[in-house]
Amino acid sequence: MKESILDVLLYLFEHYFSEDADLVRDRDSLQNGLIQAGFSPAEISKAFDWLDALAEQRPSVARPHVDGPVRIYHGPELDKLDVDCRGFLLFLEQHRILDADQRELVLDRAMALDQDELDLDDLKWVVLMVLFNQPGAEAAYAWMETQMFLDEPEPVH
């Protein structure tokens, strides 16, 4: 049995959300599909809560990118996100893939996962899901999606 929130989220993203973003599915049919795929109802519920929290934090319009101070990580964030993860977030922000608000949303959603540590691949999926849910982030999402599925990363222009 698959038992992590991230596993449920990745399954949803790969099998439902990325296939046809315009197709609306009700929660019950999604839950039934997830149960048939082997996920526990408890983890499915946590994944839906995670998605609900992401949707609640979605801005109504895209905000302009503003350079700001460097993010200082603390306690639990340092424990959960290793130096590669933190460096990747800095890279994304410096290259304007993420703005400061999106970075904070990525951090919030990463910290909400019930895992002690996230590796870089896990964090990339969180970034991809956050960008998927952001208005005006289509180019950033497309770039990030390319990075996820290419053997050699594409340079940022």
Curated annotation (Swiss-Prot):
A Pfam family annotated for this UniProt entry: DUF494
Source domain of life is Bacteria
Q: Which InterPro entries match?
A: Smg
Q: Which family does it belong to?
A: Belongs to the Smg family.
**Known PANTHER family for this protein?**
PROTEIN SMG
Protein name, entry field: Protein Smg homolog
